[in-house]
Amino acid sequence: MALDLKKYVASIPDYPEPGIIFRDISPLMADGEAYREATDQIVQFARDKHVDMIVGPEARGFIVGCPVAYELGVGFAPARKKGKLPRETVKATYDLEYGQSALYLHKDAIKPGQNVLVTDDLLATGGTISATIQMVEELGGNVVGTAFLVELKELHGRDKIKDYDMLSLMQF
């Protein structure tokens, strides 16, 4: 029987500002059984998608994507913030509450035609994941799915990626 993964997510009220409930996945990662269960569920979601590569945005997308890539026997490519990748990159911007931010991916991270699963810890507004998908597709990758530990349903991030197969392990 699968674990109730929500028990491993701490809800911190009024962080980082009043009115926000921060969903902290640190307890899930600190518990080997829960972390394994979450990883296994994403691996099962990915198995029939013939995934060639996992891409995850900085920084917690690495925490989700790397163990999935390992279990599937495929590579992992990090989508990073400005100045963190040493070779030629592609860039995608996304909106923040007050301004914009950007992610970068090495131009050789994805080969044309590769099947890519995009992973992150949390789906909120969908900006980060949309930017990551944009870069994968610009490089010729085929996004076969997206996977998240947590989805904040009230922020409607799912609407931005409705054309992609999606897994969220927990909804708040």
UniProtKB/Swiss-Prot annotation:
GO terms, molecular function: adenine binding; adenine phosphoribosyltransferase activity; AMP binding
S-S bonds: none
Annotated pathway: Purine metabolism; AMP biosynthesis via salvage pathway; AMP from adenine: step 1/1
One GO BP: AMP salvage
CDD domains: PRTases_typeI
Database matches in SUPFAM superfamilies: PRTase-like (SSF53271)
Catalytic activity as recorded in UniProt: AMP + diphosphate = 5-phospho-alpha-D-ribose 1-diphosphate + adenine
Record's GO cellular component terms: cytoplasm
Key words of the record: Cytoplasm, Glycosyltransferase, Purine salvage, Transferase
InterPro entries: Ade_phspho_trans (IPR005764), PRibTrfase_dom (IPR000836), PRTase-like (IPR029057), UPRTase/APRTase (IPR050054)
Subunit structure: Homodimer.
PANTHER family: ADENINE PHOSPHORIBOSYLTRANSFERASE
Role of this protein: Catalyzes a salvage reaction resulting in the formation of AMP, that is energically less costly than de novo synthesis.
Family: Belongs to the purine/pyrimidine phosphoribosyltransferase family.
UniProt protein name: Adenine phosphoribosyltransferase
Organism the protein comes from: Lactiplantibacillus plantarum (strain ATCC BAA-793 / NCIMB 8826 / WCFS1)
Gene (name only): apt
